[in-house]
């Protein structure tokens, strides 16, 4: 598959944009569980109060809290609020770092204050030495108490303070929920827009790759000599030019849309899970290990059959093409039954291989879902114990589940790749095999032109020829000269090399030994197009292309006039049957000339 990447250079800009959009989508998707956690924990449980830092506080309450702090902390808290108006202090604009420091100082002070209030102790009546002792005890206890419990006590204190000031707690909660909900909606829309753009661009890049590969394969095949055509076979070249390129194109769409996204969302999800400090990271390790074992096992079992699949498709195409091409011969010799059995055998082998591969892959999704649901149950079970101990909040557990599911989905995406990758990889190698094939008939670096003095002379000088891979020579030490105006005929039994000898002149094959010269120039030193333009070649089997009679007559001379076309038809003794047709030169010709007789 890596060989295909070098053919995507013209799309590098689009690929960079796709990766950037995938990061945007991943950022949005990873932010949503965090907002869900905040809505549950802060919006619902804490009534919209996020931490121990109140937006408003009575001056008397603030003074009471500062008495329960170290002097430096008290000064920092006092500086963060405006001077009292009507006995109310308001929080200034502060940075997030400052808010975290205030949260730590106020949270501890509020916890101590609530403890004293529950015991009916007035803080203003407590000596400073005793306050200092209580703070030291609170610090020691804080190390044993989870942050969640401290936060809950501080939030309760803030709620009571807001109620004492006459604030509408329901409205505060509703404002927080609406604000968080709109932020979630915005992120969801950004994620959706990024996903749509990625899908569009991925399809565009993959389609462009398919277009370029088809063009390159076509140009390469056109340059093949008969030796390369015999090596690949026509059926195989058709499969490689269509089905194989389609497989690669589909895979590249998945790579850009899903496979690149999987590691981004997976690594991001793992990072978020580690940041939660939930104590359940080991569950994630269990999930990843189970998924890895599942995917590797399925790949080991199915990969050999995937490699075999394309070969079987080639075989089926070959038999189908042979049957359709030789249909009249099959009917003439009444071998329909034999050909049916031959086709059925190839078709059955392809079906069995496909069934095996599909059965292997059908296990993947149910097992993935089993692992996913099992991990969810395990998280809820373990998380419930942590919540009961006060070490975890419900929203954090929900976020942990969502992050874990995102990580598992990343592996699920990669497993989808494992379904297509083996087959597409084989297809990519088969395409690369065509593109990397060295053409045996090459253009000379410095082409020569034949002498005008000896126009029309063809000379064979000690020519020998052996087909690629053959042990014996078809032609051995052939020497003769055909001069201008002479008619030379080759007479011999079947397989004696008559057609082979003629095929050497237009360089369908190159001689093994010796040389063929036209007007004194070795044909290997001539430009191939120039060489073939000097020859009139009539193949043993007539070939017509789909189109019209005129388009087929123009095949060797696109700029020919109607007078020249009529002259060619007269020479070929075709004028009579062309004139008899209603549309004349514009009469349609089917592929292979199947709608005209053999003589025509």
Regions from the PLM with identified roles:
Residues 32, 36, 182, 198, ...:
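Hydrophobic/aromatic residues in alpha-helical transmembrane segments
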Residues 226-227, 243-252, 256, 260, ...:
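An intracellular "coupling" helix at the cytosolic face of ABC transporter transmembrane type-1 domains
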Residues 15, 68, 89, 99, ...:
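ABC-type nucleotide-binding domain
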Residues 268, 272-289, 293, 299-300, ...:
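Helix-loop-helix
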Residues 1-32, 36-185, 190, 194, ...:
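Membrane-integrated ABC transporters
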Residues 16-27, 185, 189, 193, ...:
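Generic alpha-helical transmembrane segments of integral inner-membrane proteins
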Residues 44-51, 58-62, 69-70, 122-123, ...:
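Short intracellular "coupling" helices and adjacent cytoplasmic loop segments at the cytosolic face
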